[in-house]
Amino acid sequence: MTSQAFPKKALAGVRILELGPYVALPMTGRILAAMGAEVIKVETNKVLDEMNFIPAWSRGGGQPEFQRAKKRITIDVRTPDGLEVFKELVKVSDVFMTNFRRNILDRWGIDFPELRRLRPDIILMWQTGLGGIGPYYTYKSYGILVQHMGGVSLMSGEEGEPPATINTSYSDYHTGVFQPVAIMGVLMRRRLTGQPASMESSIFKSGAVTAGPALLDYQSTGRMPERIGNRDPNAAPHGVYRCKGDDRWCAVAVQTGDQWAGFRQAIGDPDWCSEDAFASLESRLANQDRLDELVGAWTAGQTAEDVMTRLQESGVPASLVSQGKDLYEGPHLKAREFYRTTPFYLADRSKPAWEWEGMEGISSANPPKLSESPMDYGHYSNIGEDNDYVFKEILGMSDVEVQRLHENQSLF
């Protein structure tokens, strides 16, 4: 079979039903949609995802980032008519994924046994904060809480200070990357065996895997992790150093003898570099306070870009600490085609023209670049914009029926 016989997109022909808010689940759908799957995002105007409230209305940063390339529809599954429409969609979908609690799904009448009855070979994915079993499974969880429970924050922060929060939902993003891999795996299994599958995923576990070294250290030695700020037990100098400019910094890591020689060359090999206190990694680790002061005195007179360039040219790992401007205007991500200009299409022209016409948003690409089936980033549509396509073309509903269910707020 020639390559032309395969679909252009890696997941073309796969239909996925997504029901749930926040970051991890929409991130999963975003990745699968970019790879060609038809991801139908089920929402309702009655209870909006918090991402809609990041300014501006319905165009907040979270929306173009997580909802692009999806088919966005409105169904209130809590209504009898809405529930029936949702069940019809289940019958024509390959995957159903959600992050609602099971007791909520049970109350709505879309528990997993019922979904499997509607489509016996459907793949079911349930994502929670802490998982579906275990002593904490009923606990409420949210971003920062799961981050701390996962253990990474215990290692973050300065010596003698409280654990430091990483100010982004990194566990959600990890989960959003792990879940597409699992879904593609069970899709392949179903193709090979014809058998369906269910999976359960937790944000807690996705965060805990990044604390692996601390877990292994405790298991083998009984040691607890220590907070050491930006330092590293196997490198010196190792830290983030202030540079010329407003809140400009550069990260530097010197691990090997060759890197230390390159570092000395890059900074002009001042006399202090020849002191016995800095002759070996062990001695540099023992004298880090003074070493950091000396390195910081050198970086303070240079731009972060110059520090990075000079050290890298001498074989020393170094990087500026990027601000938003660096990420957006920097040459490397542009060369990687990381940013996408995403147009805003709006079917509902009841909004004032000045609010919508000509609007575009910038969103990030998925990190992998596929050579033969490039990612499809589509456009950013408004909530409910794809109602006609899904209800009329996929489900074959009439204009009259769609209008009736919209008026009684089942499709709202």
Spans of model-derived segments:
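N-terminal helix-loop segment corresponding to the beta1-alpha1 unit
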Residues: 1-195, 227, 353-355, 382, ...
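Glycine-rich beta-alpha junction loops
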Residues: 46, 129-131, 203-208, 245, ...
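Short Gly/Pro-enriched turn/cap motifs at secondary-structure boundaries
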Residues: 63, 225-233, 240, 252, ...
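A short glycine-threonine-serine/GTX helix/turn-capping micro-motif
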Residues: 163-174, 196-198, 228-229, 236-238, ...
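Oxidoreductase and adenylate-handling cofactor-binding alpha/beta cores
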Residues: 176-197, 209, 213-221, 264-271
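Aromatic-enriched alpha-helical interface/lid elements that frame and gate functional surfaces
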Residues: 237-314, 318
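An anion-binding loop in the catalytic cleft
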Residues: 243-248, 304, 361-412
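A glycine-rich dinucleotide-binding beta-alpha-beta segment and adjacent secondary-structure elements
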Residues: 314-374
